[in-house]
Amino acid sequence: MIVPDLFVAHFREAAPYIRQMRGKTLVAGIDDRLLEGDTLNKFAADIGLLSQLGIRLVLIHGARHFLDRHAAAQGRTPHYCRGLRVTDETSLEQAQQFAGTVRSRFEAALCGSVSGFARAPSVPLVSGNFLTARPIGVIDGTDMEYAGVIRKTDTAALRFQLDAGNIVWLPPLGHSYSGKTFHLDMLQTAASVAVSLQAEKLVYLTLSDGISRPDGTLAVTLSAQEAQSLAEHAGGETRRLISSAVAALEGGVHRVQILNGAADGSLLQELFTRNGIGTSIAKEAFVSIRQAHSGDIPHIAALIRPLEEQGILLHRSREYLENHISEFSILEHDGNLYGCAALKTFAEADCGEIACLAVSPQAQDGGYGERLLAHIIDKARGIGISRLFALSTNTGEWFAERGFQTASEDELPETRRKDYRSNGRNSHILVRRLHR
């Protein structure tokens, strides 16, 4: 049973992310262990949904674990060099057989995901010789045999299929100009294709929850630099995963996400919720604070309106915001505005006021108020302000916990004192001395 209030709240939270992703390209690298049983069926249903939401999809699957299982069953030991599989002729043939079988399974699951709706549009799946490969050759004295690497991606042909509304399905295989077939590494291939298409997102669907920090906790968001630091302490596969992710980011991919594809709905949760469910890696930091500009005014007005209606903030007209936009800083998370604050200065005093500090109700637990306060304090120090005050009707305790002390109106600059007396709000006055 769907709880109506929860459904509405979640759908509203998802709306801006759905809008952001419509018409954008997503490349997914899929661990082959996810392409069987009920996990495959649920994944196919989610892929069908993403396609119908207007997201352009390229899916690339691996074959490593399938080949390892077959090698073990035949009494053979798989060999790897720098994390890449040495692919003999037998393994290549098995990879080709697996590619055909798993595509057929996925097609069936994709059709089954919309079969309950008589008028549901079809979700076409296409494959082709989009990838030209070459042999890796010899690494550290080891002949990699039929292990290959992408030589060229037919980007125009891929875009043609995506423009037509088709989902592109790529096996971990590529063909050379001499007519030979090579087994490709899924991690590297997905990153390479994502760069060629300048994809909005590259998603790696694995059997782990994401990238863990040294203390075992999940790293929810990482910059490329932070990810590389974690790679130094990670195991071989995680190190290769991070390396591929960073290569994609440096090649122009906007975001790389790593999540547990075995968790039901994980792809939807990662794409369409603010906090996601796995690890998200960007070239730069996710949360940023910047100077506001005129284009931010509608968003600032929408953010502070509920607080104005509750009497927590003083009403500010659009004209006021236009005239004072230079005082405002805004906090963004993943490109969305979640908070704002203003620093007011006074010509006759070495003090300033933090005003209009507001954080979106959807982000109250993110520590964004703390970040905005720290930003305003740094900004105030930078222009020589030694005292920062805040006027508050009901958040005085929050400021007191952060070093502000109760003060009298006599400590306000004269111009601010006049406003304080005339507006009738009788706000608490709090002051924090700023040490350089």
UniProtKB/Swiss-Prot annotation:
Q: Does the keyword Transmembrane helix apply?
A: no
- Any single GO BP term: L-arginine biosynthetic process
Give the N-acetyltransferase domain ranges: 287-436
* SUPFAM superfamilies, alphabetized: Acyl-CoA N-acyltransferases (Nat), Carbamate kinase-like
Give the pathway.
Amino-acid biosynthesis; L-arginine biosynthesis; N(2)-acetyl-L-ornithine from L-glutamate: step 1/4
- EC number(s) stated in the UniProt entry for this protein: 2.3.1.1
Q: Which GO terms describe its cellular component?
A: cytoplasm
Q: Which PROSITE patterns has this protein been placed in?
A: GNAT (PS51186)
Superkingdom: Bacteria
Q: Which Gene3D superfamilies match?
A: 3.40.630.30, Acetylglutamate kinase-like
Question: Which CDD domains did the record assign?
Answer: AAK_NAGS-ABP (cd04237), NAT_SF (cd04301)
Top class in the EC scheme: transferase
Report the GO molecular function annotations: L-glutamate N-acetyltransferase activity
Q: What PANTHER family is this protein classified in?
A: AMINO-ACID ACETYLTRANSFERASE, AMINO-ACID ACETYLTRANSFERASE NAGS1, CHLOROPLASTIC-RELATED
Regarding protein family, the annotation reads: Belongs to the acetyltransferase family. ArgA subfamily.
Q: Mention any additional remark.
A: In bacteria which possess the bifunctional enzyme ornithine acetyltransferase/N-acetylglutamate synthase (ArgJ), ArgA fulfills an anaplerotic role.
Could you identify this protein by its name?
Answer: Amino-acid acetyltransferase
Starting at the broadest rank, the lineage of the source organism is: Bacteria, Pseudomonadati, Pseudomonadota, Betaproteobacteria, Neisseriales
